[in-house]
């Protein structure tokens, strides 16, 4: 079972940041999940929100600013003064950091009412993944399945992961069209039946966002392929405990 750091390295470090990715790599995580937004100058930056206010304290919309404008903004001090000076990353910078070290789940963000304005997004994203030789270890995800279909049509080489928070049975036509390698359901919609049905079709399951220890254990027993979490350290401990071989003397002593 893979451990996937949500928004990079989990909630103990600035989200979608260089420090977050460095933290994930230092933990030896199998994969990270990051968010990217397209910018006004047709680039991609690591950022979660449509509005920049929560992380930067400034007013503005991510899609309406250039990458240079966004990279002047500080995003670390709201987590801790230890991270003051943390800057927004370009997508290519993140790919360079992760190459050969961890797999990537890439959530593409875009406001629905501006889909027609940003028709270049899927083709450019496909180009970057090809240019950076990142196709084999990157899965592109989105709640916007129309965007995923555009990406799938732009390049069948891109690995698709479907994010959703609804019912599995309502997605069958979209699954047939998108041919995803993974489904990323909300943890509350993740059931043994879903895992079994998806696996029968060769589709991996990665529930999000799982932060409770008991649910981590439950999904591990359920046989999911990985867990997306804000608490990767806790999941590492769980996986290590589960994998620890039983000492013979401990086994004998258990019958006392």
Please report, for each region that a protein language model flagged, where it lies by residue:
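Phosphate-group recognition and catalysis centered on beta-loop-alpha active-site segments
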Residues: 1-256
């Amino acid at each position: 079972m893979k451990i996937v750091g949500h928004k990079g390295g989990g909630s103990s470090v600035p989200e979608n940041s260089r420090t977050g990715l460095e933290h994930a790599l230092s933990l030896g995580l199998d994969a990270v999940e990051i968010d990217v937004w397209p910018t006004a100058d047709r680039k991609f930056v690591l950022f979660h929100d449509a509005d920049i206010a929560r992380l930067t304290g400034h007013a503005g919309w991510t899609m309406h600013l250039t990458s240079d404008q966004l990279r002047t903004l500080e995003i670390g001090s709201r987590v801790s003064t230890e991270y003051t000076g943390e800057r927004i990353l370009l997508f290519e910078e993140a790919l360079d950091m992760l190459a050969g070290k961890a797999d990537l789940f890439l959530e593409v963000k875009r406001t629905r009412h501006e889909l027609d304005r940003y028709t270049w997004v899927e083709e450019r994203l496909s180009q970057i993944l090809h240019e950076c030789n990142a196709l084999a270890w990157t899965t592109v995800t989105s709640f916007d399945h129309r965007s995923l279909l555009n990406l799938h049509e732009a390049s069948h080489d891109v690995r698709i992961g479907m994010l959703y928070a609804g019912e599995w049975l309502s997605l069958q036509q979209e699954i047939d069209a998108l041919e995803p390698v993974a489904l990323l359901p909300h943890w509350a919609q993740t059931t043994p039946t879903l895992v079994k049905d998806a696996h029968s079709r060769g589709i991996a399951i990665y529930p999000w966002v799982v932060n409770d220890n008991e649910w981590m254990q439950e999904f591990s027993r359920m046989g999911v392929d990985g867990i997306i979490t804000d608490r990767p350290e806790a999941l590492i401990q769980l996986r290590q405990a589960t994998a620890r071989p039983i000492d013979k003397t401990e086994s004998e002593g258990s019958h006392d």
